[in-house]
Each structure stands twice: as structure tokens, then as C-alpha cells.
Amino acid sequence: MSNHFSADNLKFPGDDRRLDMTDLFAFPAPGGEHHHGLLRRHQTGTTALILDSNPTSAPPPIPAPVTGPEFHPDAVYRINIDTDGDAQADIAFTFTFSAFDNGVQTGTAWYATGSQARQPGPVGEQLTSSLPVSFDGTVRPVQAGAIRLAAGLRSDPFFADVEGALHGFHWTGHDDFADNNVDSIALEVPDDMLGDGPVIGVWASISLRRDGQLVQMDRGGNPTINPFINPDGEKNLYNSRQPADDVANYLGPWSKILENAGGYSPEEARTAALMVLPDILHYDRTKPANYPNGRVLTDDVYSIRFAWLSNGKIPPAGLKPHDDLLAEFPYTGPPNP
């Protein structure tokens, strides 16, 4: 799993797969190359951001999902951008969705900056109130000024040999996510709307309206973190917290886990833990995008995470990326039958 099944006991947050954030990606949009001057960054590039959620299937022994393919109508889906390194949102893209009615659903999107980006609800400039959610694979993008958006059911780009991991890392060569689908939100955003500097931090969250309040149900920046390192009894709490508190909350416990799991020295374990704390995906747009610098759809983050946990002792799983990826927006493949 990447961030799939991130609640305690390998369940969905709130026992609802629509609240399960599965993956987050950040990479340069093809044709929108990044150009950088020596003294001042000349921002002519475009960054692609993708938030996936709502996995349509689950490998054993995880119980199969029972809810539908739509976005949750009472949830707030958010992509947060930190532009100054303080683990606080300076920019936020927020999405809500209508009720699912006879196979039809529509989204509303907002773009917030400054203090508004740190408010949990949908605030800021409304980009669109008529974002069509596609369930049949047809791409229905909306152009909101300089930002391109799309939402719908897509093929899950994550690939992993779960059976092999459950059997002592004797890899089987089987991709348990080959036929999985997810709900995907894709954006192309001009770089000059993502801060002045080349480095950004990205994380996503899904919150649920409950008793008049927004309750954060899932969150993540780096792939394969919460389901991999936090023990049961800690996962739900982790999902409810904010990245700004991660170092204080998790540096000690995670360093100890890494010492025990990978044979790291205490100093090495601390350094390894700080590679993913706070849990924010860092992306330097002056450098090629491959995890841990941003994340592209072909990154083998499953193997990367096990190597991190084991201090290089667990070999790569040997799987290849999915062959249905697109070279153009929205980049993920059409949904599997």
C-alpha cells in the first residue's frame, strides 16, 4: 500500500473508502519546462499535482470496499503547499463534491493563499463550481484561468507486491494493484502561483463534516508512511494531526523503530526519520522530479520505503510501472473494467 488503508487495523478512515487518501504526486507538466536564472527565478513552468483517493479494491487480507466510486459529498479534499519551509500551508487547493445522483457528480474548487490557506474549510477564490466528475474514462477538464483541473475515476498508478511482503519479502512478481481504480483530482498549475522560490512542500488531506465541524480523516505527503511505520492504535491519531507537529510527535518513536527494524545507529536512525519528517513531499523545481524530490507516477515507492525501513537489506520488488499511464493531462490511465 502507498497511503491506502491508512486507518488502524488496515481499514479505511471512518470505515469509508471515499475518505481514504491513497497517493499524492508532484512533477513538472510536460511542455511546461522550468527555467531558472542565476539571480532571479524566471517562472515559466507548470507543475502537475495529483491527489488520489477511494480505492475500488483491496488485496487480501484487507476487507473489500463496500461504498461506491464517487467522491464523498460531505468531505473536503485538499492539496496544501508550503512555500517557506515552516510546515504550514501558504497555498491550498480545496475541493468539495455534490451528492452522487444517477451516476452524476460535480465538484467545486477553490484556490486560497496566505492565512486563508490555513483555514480547514473551502475558502479563497472559487475556481469553478461545475467540475464534472467522469466515471467512464472520458477526460473532462476545466480551465479556470491559468489552472487546469479534472476529476474522476482513473486507473490506480500505484504498484506493489503485497503478497510478497506478507511472506517474508519473497517477491512473487504479482502487482496487487494492477486492476485497481481510484478517484483522482488532477491539476496543472503555473509555477508563479506556487510561490516565489523553487522549493515547495506538498501534502494532502481529506476531512469530513461531522456535527458542524470538519474532522480530518486522512493526510499525507510522502508515500508509504503511515500504513508502514505507525503501529495500530496510532494510525488514526496520526491522520488527525498536522505536519507542523510531526517532528515533535514522531522523531523519537520513529527513530527507535528504524533502529530496531533496520539496524541503524541512533544517529543514523534520526537522520533517516528526518528524511520523511515532517510528512511533507518536498519538490525542488530546479531539479529532476523523482521521489524523494517530488513524485512521478512511475516511482517505485514500495521498494524505496522497504529499503528505508530495512537500511537497504530488503531488495527491490522488481515490479514495473503500469502501462496505461498517459503522457498528457490528467496523466493517470482510464479506469479498469
Which role does the model predict for each range below?
Residues 1-337:
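Surface-exposed extracytoplasmic segments
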